[in-house]
């Protein structure tokens, strides 16, 4: 389990324990945070689970792959710390990480 912090679009902070083996997307949806649409269900084909990752944790994440990079390129809100939450597996190294849900495109 890892402590995860999620900032929603209205600035609300949600803190909770996320099970190892889940993705950040799955953990957020299990908390009932509905604004993370994740329309494709985690297949890396829609970019509706776009989040901004806390800078200190970027090096602890798996490398950005081609499909994810291409989908993020389609966002008007892409930043250097943009990732798709469906591509971020939860593990102890992510304990304390904050992600912010990106604005809708």
UniProtKB/Swiss-Prot annotation:
Reaction(s) the record says it catalyses: 5,5'-dehydrodivanillate + NADH + O2 + H(+) = 2,2',3-trihydroxy-3'-methoxy-5,5'-dicarboxybiphenyl + formaldehyde + NAD(+) + H2O
Official protein name in the record: 5,5'-dehydrodivanillate O-demethylase ferredoxin subunit
SUPFAM superfamilies: 2Fe-2S ferredoxin-like (SSF54292)
UniProt note: pH dependence: Optimum pH is 6.0.
Biological-process GO terms, alphabetical: P450-containing electron transport chain
Biological function: Involved in the catabolism of 5,5'-dehydrodivanillate (DDVA), an intermediate in the biodegradation of lignin. Part of a three-component monooxygenase that catalyzes the O-demethylation of DDVA, leading to the formation of 2,2',3-trihydroxy-3'-methoxy-5,5'-dicarboxybiphenyl (OH-DDVA). LigXc probably functions as an intermediate electron transfer protein between LigXd and LigXa.
Domain 2Fe-2S ferredoxin-type, first and last residues per copy: 2-105
Annotated organism of origin: Sphingobium sp. (strain NBRC 103272 / SYK-6)
InterPro entries documented for this protein: 2Fe-2S_ferredoxin-like_sf (IPR036010), 2Fe-2S_ferredoxin-type (IPR001041), Adrenodoxin-like (IPR001055), Beta-grasp_dom_sf (IPR012675)
E.C. no: 1.14.13.-
One GO molecular-function entry: metal ion binding
Required cofactor(s): [2Fe-2S] cluster
Key word Ribonucleoprotein present: no
Binding site for [2Fe-2S] cluster: 40, 46, 49, 86
Species classification: Bacteria, Pseudomonadati, Pseudomonadota, Alphaproteobacteria, Sphingomonadales
